Amino acid sequence: PSTTPSASPSGTAEPGASSKPDATKAPAGNDKDDNTGGSTVKVKVGKKVTVNSSKYKVTSVSGTRAVQFTSGKKNAKNVVIPATVKISGKNYKVTSIANNAFKNNKKLKKVTIGVNVNKIGKAAFKGCKNLKSIIIKTKKLTAKKVGANAFKGINKKATFKVPKKKVKAYKKIVKAKGAAKTVKVKK
């Protein structure tokens, strides 16, 4: 194995934000669809990695590989929490959003939550007063899996776009988790 770390172009990195590769693993099999923002690090549970200016924490490396979204680019106005991210040539499902992930982010206006997210942490979007558009692609959220005050303090005119069969259930969840009664939940 080569000792030279391989790097993929990922735009401008924040100082100290990128993880140093401990060992470079060659991608297994035919990973020809390598995304340009992938990260190459020694992967273990609890490891924090940065992919495309967003930070993740590895939650599972065996069976279904999974990560938790911990934070996005500091002053981003539009954030997409993807279905998967590529780390060391392997795909990891993004299954959760950390507590306080975007708390008090005044710049954030739009968030897209990927199809594999099944948990949103406490106060994840609390105080994001300019957050007006939330697209939820996942069908896996329940009241127990969305933390307290997850949507408290978002824009009172915010619109949630959710899967067709989840409009009624998600309307109850977002309002129970702090969103104003004036927010709209639609398909």
Regions found by a protein language model. Give the residues of each.
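Consensus positions within tandem repeat domains that build extended binding/scaffold surfaces
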Residues: 99-100, 121-124, 147-150
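Polycationic, low-complexity disordered segments in secreted or periplasmic proteins
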Residues: 18, 24, 44, 48, ...
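A structural signal for leucine-rich repeat
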Residues: 126, 148-153, 172-177
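Structural signature of tandem-repeat unit edges
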Residues: 20, 64, 74-96, 106-119, ...
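Ser/Thr/Gly/Pro-rich low-complexity, disordered linker/stalk segments of secreted
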Residues: 1-44
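Intrinsic disorder/low-complexity signature
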Residues: 19, 27-32, 72-75, 102, ...
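N-terminal segments that cap or nucleate solenoid repeat domains
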Residues: 35-90, 95-106
